[in-house]
């Protein structure tokens, strides 16, 4: 499965680890993703999605309506 958040669209970014000696090593920065089961009240069913930590915070504040609209 891809490492992309369903709600926010966050995906891996590429950059450099820089040492004290200023050596650059290419690296991949992964988003903070979690696989969650979320109850969608409108459809009366559980949905399994990959969400970032920020997306979980958005859902807890605004509810699952935004997520249900994206999954249709």
Curated annotation (Swiss-Prot):
One of its GO terms (molecular function) is structural constituent of ribosome. Keywords: Ribonucleoprotein, Ribosomal protein. It comes from the Bacteria. SUPFAM superfamilies: L28p-like (SSF143800). One of its GO terms (biological process) is translation. InterPro entries: Ribosomal_bL28, Ribosomal_bL28/bL31-like_sf, Ribosomal_bL28_bact-type, Ribosomal_bL28_sf. It holds the Pfam family Ribosomal_L28. GO terms for cellular component: ribonucleoprotein complex; ribosome. PANTHER family: 39S RIBOSOMAL PROTEIN L28, MITOCHONDRIAL (PTHR13528), LARGE RIBOSOMAL SUBUNIT PROTEIN BL28M (PTHR13528:SF2). Belongs to the bacterial ribosomal protein bL28 family. This is Large ribosomal subunit protein bL28. It comes from Chlorobium limicola (strain DSM 245 / NBRC 103803 / 6330).
């Amino acid at each position: 499965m891809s490492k992309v958040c369903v709600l926010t669209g966050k995906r891996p970014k590429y950059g450099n680890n820089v040492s004290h000696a200023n050596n650059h090593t290419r690296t991949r920065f992964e988003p903070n993703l979690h696989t969650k089961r979320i109850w969608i009240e409108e459809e009366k069913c559980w949905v399994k999605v990959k969400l970032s930590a920020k997306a979980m915070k958005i859902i807890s504040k605004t509810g699952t309506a935004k997520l249900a609209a994206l999954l249709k």
